């Protein structure tokens, strides 16, 4: 897959941009703060419906405007599709494929695929579990687009279950974990409230287990498929370092281990386990029942994929806290490259985006990275200064300076104004 055209209007610093792209390597060069990252961020947003830099869509809309537009034409095995997204500072976004309106922006998932690495990815190694869950979920919805709706439904059900645990805490505590027969001493009204809350909690348990099981099973499959690519790419980037490995860890690991399923594997050469949705659902449902007194007491959901994590192992130690700065960078970059090679194996090769990456790598790692990306159909790179561009790329890459792109956009806008004036005459 490659992107042949990218158009932006009122997206962050870009009032207008109409960019023709081709397979191969394209580099956007310019000082920090001048808009080069905004270009690749926009393409990444179209692919994943989220930004790697901010959580709020409002930040993506140019100051003083209400709507930002992103359009990209993707070419996959000779077939062209154009994805268009109107991002609203307030209200719901609007999506089109070619000229057809979509019911949801989630319908765009899979039209454009990207693997984006940026300095923020260091948080994959050093940050909190939420960062690693987000990494897996971005791959999940690209690989299995229908699970985007499952994830949204899970998040909604989780909020409602937590609200029930908080709002009905008094009634639930009277019956959950209480001695047998104690409910006989309760008034009819309180007993009715407690029974209603319990029945509703049972419903949310079932929904959360069914939805969460699909997410867990997909994540475990992704980790299983990523692990060998991670080992290979890390070995290529840092041949003198310890071997890298990854495994999935869940809040129901103990229950799964009782069934003979051990997700957490710390040895680099051992394959990670798989988990079927059916087993995950049954195990989650039983775990909810066992954990109910603690959840009622604390007023929150203690089990499920929203609390899971990924073990990132370097040698025999966790990468978090034990990896050096250089090893952490290489590990984070290897995770992104592993995702690229895995998706290539699936039959749909994503566009590789490297946002200000080479500035953080020594000459040896730069060359290893160039070797790894040389076979990709399309690579988009940003660099703040020319010195950050590896020599091996200078003769083969198309290099745009941000000033060139801004001047081109300005000329296009001026022509449009003149054409409008001519039409008025």
UniProtKB/Swiss-Prot annotation:
Binding site for ATP: 30-37
Coiled-coil blocks: none
Chief location of this protein within or outside the cell: cytoplasm
InterPro entries membership: DNA-binding_RecF (IPR001238), DNA-binding_RecF_CS (IPR018078), P-loop_NTPase (IPR027417), RecF/RecN/SMC_N (IPR003395), RecF_2 (IPR042174)
GO cellular component, one term: cytoplasm
One GO MF term attached to the UniProt entry: single-stranded DNA binding
Entry keywords, A to Z: ATP-binding, Cytoplasm, DNA damage, DNA repair, DNA replication, DNA-binding, Nucleotide-binding, SOS response
BP terms from Gene Ontology: DNA replication; DNA synthesis involved in DNA repair; double-strand break repair; SOS response
Physiological role: The RecF protein is involved in DNA metabolism; it is required for DNA replication and normal SOS inducibility. RecF binds preferentially to single-stranded, linear DNA. It also seems to bind ATP.
Protein family (similarity comment): Belongs to the RecF family.
HAMAP family listed in its UniProt record: RecF (MF_00365)
PANTHER family hit by this protein: DNA REPLICATION AND REPAIR PROTEIN RECF
Protein name: DNA replication and repair protein RecF
């Amino acid at each position: 897959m490659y992107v042949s055209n990218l158009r932006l209007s009122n997206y962050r610093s870009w009032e207008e941009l109409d960019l023709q792209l081709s397979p191969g390597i394209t580099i956007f060069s310019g000082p920090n703060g001048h808009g080069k990252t905004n270009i690749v961020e926009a393409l990444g947003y179209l692919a994943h419906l989220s930004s790697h830099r901010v959580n709020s869509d409002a930040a993506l809309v140019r100051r003083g405007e209400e709507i930002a537009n992103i359009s990209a034409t993707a070419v996959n095995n000779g077939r062209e599709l154009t994805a268009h997204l109107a991002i609203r500072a307030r209200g719901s976004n609007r999506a089109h494929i070619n000229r057809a309106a979509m019911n949801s922006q989630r319908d765009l998932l899979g039209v454009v695929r990207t693997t984006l690495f940026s300095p923020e990815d260091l948080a994959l190694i050093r940050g909190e579990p939420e960062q690693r869950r987000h990494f897996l979920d971005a791959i999940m919805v690209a690989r299995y687009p229908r699970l985007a709706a499952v994830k949204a439904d899970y998040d909604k059900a989780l909020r409602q279950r937590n609200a029930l645990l908080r709002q009905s805490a008094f009634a639930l505590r009277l019956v959950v974990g209480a001695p047998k027969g104690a409910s006989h001493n309760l008034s009819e009204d309180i007993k009715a409230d407690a029974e209603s809350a319990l029945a509703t909690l049972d419903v949310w348990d079932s929904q959360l287990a069914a939805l969460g099981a699909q997410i867990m099973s997909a994540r475990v499959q992704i980790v299983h498929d990523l692990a060998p690519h991670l080992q290979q790419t890390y070995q290529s980037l840092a041949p003198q370092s310890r071997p890298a490995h990854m495994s999935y860890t869940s809040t129901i690991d103990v229950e799964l281990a009782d069934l003979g399923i051990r997700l957490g594997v710390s040895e680099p050469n051992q394959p990670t386990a798989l988990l079927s949705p059916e087993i995950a659902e049954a195990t989650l449902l039983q775990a909810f029942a066992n954990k109910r007194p603690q959840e009622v007491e604390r007023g929150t959901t203690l089990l499920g994929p929203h609390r899971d994590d990924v073990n990132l192992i370097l040698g025999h130690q966790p990468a978090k806290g034990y990896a050096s700065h250089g090893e952490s960078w290489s590990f984070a970059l290897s995770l992104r490259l592993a995702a690229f090679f895995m998706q290539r194996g699936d039959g749909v090769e994503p566009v590789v985006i490297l946002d200000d990456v080479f500035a953080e790598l020594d000459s040896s790692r730069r060359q290893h990275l160039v070797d790894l990306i040389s076979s990709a159909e399309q690579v988009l790179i940003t660099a703040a200064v020319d010195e950050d561009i590896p020599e091996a790329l200078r003769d083969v890459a198309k290099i745009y300076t941000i000033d060139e792109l801004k001047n081109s956009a300005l000329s296009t806008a001026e022509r449009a104004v003149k054409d409008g004036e001519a039409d008025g005459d």
